[in-house]
């Protein structure tokens, strides 16, 4: 449990790289990058794993990256959403239980669960299992009305908000997530894309 959020709190923020339609059809892969930071000030490391586009391995790859890393002083796992590589959905409870670390999801747009369910029904034989993972995710709360939403497992909304403020240098997105996005997109396309 996090009692006080220190300016140098150790966090890892994960985001995925871009992928093409052909990689979806061929069940290709995309990279998942985690940037380990002390607050918003110092990058101390980078983690990476390859995940299957529209697969079911994102949760296991995240667990593996965190548990088997040399960074044993991590306090929080940050995610930029719960779907990676298309519909490779992260089970937030499992990630929390198997790593022992609180999970903080940061998103800019409120997801449309009905549209997600419709897409899952249309494209995936295992749509029920995938949708159940989405449905079990904790409720969203607005940090900045209409602009920034959070989901948490193992953190109070107040502590989560404080962690976001502590780890954000510029803009709305915490620095570990912003950098993870840039690195992952550069690996996949040869150049970083804007957050």
UniProtKB/Swiss-Prot annotation:
InterPro entries: Endo_dU (IPR002802)
Pfam families: DUF99
UniProt-listed HAMAP family: UPF0215
Matches recorded under NCBIfam families: PRK00766.1 (NF001977)
Protein family according to the UniProt entry: Belongs to the UPF0215 family.
Record's protein name: UPF0215 protein TGAM_0348
Organism, as annotated: Thermococcus gammatolerans (strain DSM 15229 / JCM 11827 / EJ3)
Organism lineage: Archaea, Methanobacteriati, Methanobacteriota, Thermococci, Thermococcales
